[in-house]
C-alpha cells in the first residue's frame, strides 16, 4: 500500500461519494451520538465559511428530526468575531441558511487583547501574530465549551480530510470538539453536500480562509499552505498529482501527526 493509499484509509476518504447519501449518514451520526450521550443538543461556531455552514446545517437537520421523533434537543449557532469581521455578510447568509434554533454572538476581542497585553507585561515580549491567531482559535473553543457545559450541549468540530491531512487547524482550538460530522470529506465533496442542501453558491465558492492573522487579514488558506485545495482533494481522492505536491502533502501529514492523536504518553508508539 502506498503512503497515499495509507493516508486515504486513515482519513476515511472515499474517491467518489453520493452527496444525498452522505448527508443522510452524517445526520444519522449526529442523531445517534447525541442520543447515546444523553446530551441536550449541539453548539457550533459559525464563521460564514463552507465548513461551519455545512456542519451547522447538518446539526440543525439532526435536532429537528429528533424533535419530530419525540426528543428534546436544540442547536445553538455561535458567531465569534474578533472585532468586525470583513465577511460578516457571509456569516449572516450562513446563519439564514442554517436556520439554527438559537444564534448568539460573542466578540472575542476584549478577551484576546486582555490576554495578549498581560502576556506582554509578564513575559516582556509580544505574542507573534501567529500565536495570537492561535489564542483567538482557542478562545473561540473556550466559548463554545462554556455554552456546551452550561447547557448540556456537545461541541461540533468542522475538521475534514483536506484539513486533517495537512494539520491545518489549531490544536485545542478549532481542533477541539466532541464530534466531527465532516470527517472523511474532501473540500470539493463538502461543497457538493452544500449544493445538494440548496445553499447559496456564495457559501461554498468563497475563498477559504482561517482569518486568524491581524497582519494578513483574510489570507487565503491556499497561500498559507502553499498547496491548493484542488491538489489536496485530488491527492486524497487517489488521483495523480505532481511529485513535488505529493511530497509537500506527505511532509505536512507526517509532521502534523500529533494533532490527530491524543496527547502522547510513554505507552504510545505513533510518535516514535
Swiss-Prot record:
Keyword Cell wall biogenesis/degradation (UniProt): no
The UniProt record lists the keyword Ligase: yes
EC number assigned by the record: 6.3.1.5
Keywords assigned: ATP-binding, Ligase, Magnesium, Metal-binding, NAD, Nucleotide-binding
Binding, deamido-NAD(+): 138, 171, 178, 258-259
Binding residues annotated for Mg(2+), in chain numbering: 51, 163
Listed GO CC annotations: cytoplasm
Residues bound to ATP: 45-52, 158, 187, 209
GO molecular function, one term: ATP binding
Protein's GO biological process: NAD biosynthetic process
UniProt xrefs under Pfam families: NAD_synthase
Reaction(s) the record says it catalyses: deamido-NAD(+) + NH4(+) + ATP = AMP + diphosphate + NAD(+) + H(+)
Pathway: Cofactor biosynthesis; NAD(+) biosynthesis; NAD(+) from deamido-NAD(+) (ammonia route): step 1/1
Known role: Catalyzes the ATP-dependent amidation of deamido-NAD to form NAD. Uses ammonia as a nitrogen source.
Family: Belongs to the NAD synthetase family.
Assembly mode: Homodimer.
Record-given protein name: NH(3)-dependent NAD(+) synthetase
High-level lineage: Bacteria, Bacillati, Bacillota, Bacilli, Bacillales
Amino acid at each position: 500500500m502506498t503512503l497515499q493509499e495509507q493516508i486515504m484509509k486513515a482519513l476515511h476518504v472515499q474517491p467518489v461519494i453520493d452527496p444525498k447519501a452522505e448527508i443522510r449518514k452524517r445526520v444519522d451520526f449526529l442523531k445517534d451520538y447525541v442520543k447515546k450521550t444523553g446530551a441536550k443538543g449541539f453548539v457550533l461556531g459559525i464563521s460564514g465559511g463552507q465548513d461551519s455552514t455545512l456542519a451547522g446545517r447538518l446539526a440543525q437537520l439532526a435536532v429537528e428530526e429528533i424533535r419530530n421523533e419525540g426528543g428534546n434537543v436544540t442547536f445553538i449557532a455561535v458567531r465569534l468575531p474578533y472585532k468586525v469581521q470583513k465577511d460578516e455578510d457571509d456569516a449572516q447568509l450562513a446563519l439564514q441558511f442554517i436556520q439554527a434554533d438559537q444564534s448568539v454572538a460573542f466578540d472575542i476581542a476584549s478577551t484576546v487583547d486582555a490576554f495578549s497585553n498581560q502576556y506582554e507585561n509578564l513575559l516582556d515580549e509580544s505574542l507573534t501574530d501567529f500565536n495570537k491567531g492561535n489564542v483567538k482559535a482557542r478562545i473561540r473553543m473556550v466559548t463554545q465549551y462554556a455554552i456546551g457545559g452550561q447547557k448540556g450541549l456537545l461541541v461540533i468540530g468542522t475538521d475534514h480530510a483536506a484539513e486533517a491531512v495537512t494539520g491545518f487547524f489549531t490544536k485545542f482550538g478549532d481542533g477541539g470538539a466532541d464530534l466531527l460530522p465532516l470527517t472523511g470529506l474532501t473540500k470539493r465533496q463538502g461543497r457538493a453536500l452544500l449544493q445538494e442542501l440548496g445553499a447559496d453558491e456564495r457559501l461554498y465558492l468563497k475563498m477559504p480562509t482561517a482569518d486568524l492573522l491581524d497582519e494578513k487579514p483574510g489570507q487565503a488558506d491556499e497561500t498559507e499552505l502553499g498547496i491548493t485545495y484542488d491538489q489536496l482533494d485530488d491527492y486524497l481522492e487517489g488521483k495523480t498529482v505532481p511529485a513535488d505536491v505529493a511530497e509537500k502533502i506527505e511532509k505536512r501529514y507526517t509532521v502534523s501527526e500529533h494533532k490527530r492523536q491524543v496527547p502522547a504518553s510513554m505507552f504510545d508508539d505513533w510518535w516514535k
